[in-house]
């Protein structure tokens, strides 16, 4: 008796399902890591904007600067409390009561931020929650809101 071997049907669908599921997981992981890199660059941009504004605006407006920079950020987790603006002397020490005469540098930093990864990457960090390192920008002070004729500017 001769048995006929029948071709297995449906194996291509199973192979496609297995291969496509692995490729989709890989694709979404790459997208998630890409968005993390974009977020880190946007946080760096926030520190740069805050430092620039603090260098040209009045010292008393540092909280308003932090609020406006946080509001214009493309990252949702940044608020005014996570942006610190500090005024430094010529040695780089933080001034307790800065004035336009003793400020030589301005430092802006973003602190206490976390990033939630895509649920596929929950094995990273604590359930996908990653602590973002502190970003800071230090630049020389400029006008600090004082114009040559002695009047103050309003940033």
Map each language-model feature to its residues.
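Short, conserved structural patches
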Residues: 49, 53-155
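Alpha-helical assembly-interface signal, strongest on the long, hydrophobic N-terminal helix that forms
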Residues: 1-71
